[in-house]
Structures are given as structure tokens and as C-alpha cells.
């Protein structure tokens, strides 16, 4: 359960908070509301393995719930595919792919899938609860994110994506919502829902591009096959948004945003905000090159550039150490 005073998660059996020592409410006296159909169906699907606590939010594909793992007494997040989408073969396939893709990737900066299952039209995946929120939260709260903080986070994510790329998996939906943080501030990439092997066909039978238009590479917006450099482009957009508070392209609909991704050049972030250094802007703009060959060849190359940038900034030893540890956490073979 979560402490009502400081928000720290505590074991279900705890009487007082491990951080602030405040008395914790007894479970039977905790406020409750009549469970909706999704919660009822989820409880039926998961049985006694998880204790569903509350709904955290809802996205285009799934509802997200906070729960306790009954045996391990640790918080988890359960994503439940919307019931109407569970009847859609294409969406079911996408949701299934997320679980399978994440299960194949074991890396300290990739959010693992702990469990998955289906009971009738209730389809769910279970992941660890990450208490640090998302990069999207940080941008919304502060309008922009400190350049070194953003560089550290994206360096960690880039190393994780390089690991995925070397196993033939491209994420294809990088955005601030999918960059989460653990309690120590380490960045974790999640939501491999439209990840696919580099040389497989597109997921959609209609051939439409899958992803979020504001973060799509030009080749992805055109529905072409993509490789890891497409994710590098998306990381550049995430860095851009962290630096100035908004992505480089916007429009009234997905088509207009996709058109700009393909045909228009972004304004350099240091032109928009003079507080953005030329060095940091140059890293971002290289990621945003229209031609994949002009970008960083590998996500690890982007990580190295970001680490060099952090190293050039005085007094940021902790951020440098975190990025360097991530870079060398998994041995990486040379590019073939």
C-alpha cells in the first residue's frame, strides 16, 4: 500500500511507513469504490495472484491498474487491453507482441514483462511498478528538462535500444510517455507494443504506419521498413521536446504531422531557446536528419555523444556515472 503522507510504497503487512514512520491505514478501512466491469474482470482473470488497488489511467489501447503481487508483496502495474479491442485480431496481435518482445529482452533499462494472460476477453500483461513517473510528467511539470538530466536519461534508453536492435527488434513508438524512471532516477524504456523485427512486414494488414506521428521518423511515416536509426530519430525528438518543451512538428491531424516529418526541416532548439547549448543542439539535430545514413549509425553512438556532452559539463559527476554505467552494463559487439 502507499503511505498517505509521503507516497512511499510499503508492504501490505506494514503498520507504519518505512520512510516517514506515519501510521498506515488498515486495508479494510481504506476508501473503496464499487469496482467497474474492467476491475471485476481483471480480478476474475488473475485470481488471488494480485490484489488490484486502483486504476492509474487509460490509454488508447489499455487501462492501467496498480496492484500488489500477493506472494511477493511488491507493487506491479497491470495493463488490460480494452474489451472492445480484445475482439480485434490486429490489436490482440499487437498486445501479444508487446509481451513477447519485452520477454525476449533482458536489460536493466528495459521494463520487463513479469506475467501475461487471457481470460475470455480480458487480456493483460504485468510489469514492475516504477515509482519515478515518466519523462512526459517531468516535461509537463517543469516545461523543459535540464539538458544533463535529459542526456543521462536518453543515453540510458539509447543503450537499451541498441541492445534490442542487435537482436533484430526496433521499438517504433519512442515518446516521453514510454520513458519511465525507477526510484533511483534511472530511465527505463517500456511499451514494445508495435516493436517488430527489422525485416518483417508491417503489423497492420492495411499497411498504415503504426506509432505516434509527433515522434515518427520520415521512413516510418511513409510506411517503409525501418531499422534502429528510426528509433534514433525518435530519441532526437524526445530530446528536442525535453530541451524546449514541445516536439519540432505539430499539426491538426496525424497526416499533417507525418507530412512535416518527411518534408520539413526542424528549427534548431538553440534557435528557439538560447539556454540550449550549441553542442546539445547539434546532437539533437543529427538525430533528426531526414536521411537515416546521416543520423548516428547506432543508438550506442548516440549514447556515446550524450556521455561526451555530460562529461563537458562541470559538476555533474552523478549523471555522468549513471550514463557510463548503463553504456557498459552489457557487452556490445562492434557493428557489423
Per-segment meaning from a language model:
Residues 25-38, 293, 297-336:
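Juxtacatalytic C-terminal regulatory tail of Ser/Thr protein kinases
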Residues 116:
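Activation-segment/catalytic-loop signature of the eukaryotic protein kinase fold
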Residues 53-59, 64:
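Protein kinase glycine-rich loop
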Residues 153-154:
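Activation segment signature within eukaryotic-like protein kinase domains
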Residues 159-169:
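Protein kinase catalytic-loop region centered on the HRD/HxD motif
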Residues 120-134, 138:
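Conserved short submotifs of the Hanks-type protein kinase catalytic core
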Residues 68, 161, 180, 212-318:
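C-terminal lobe helix-coil module of Hanks-type protein kinase domains
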Residues 82-104:
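AlphaC helix of the eukaryotic protein kinase fold
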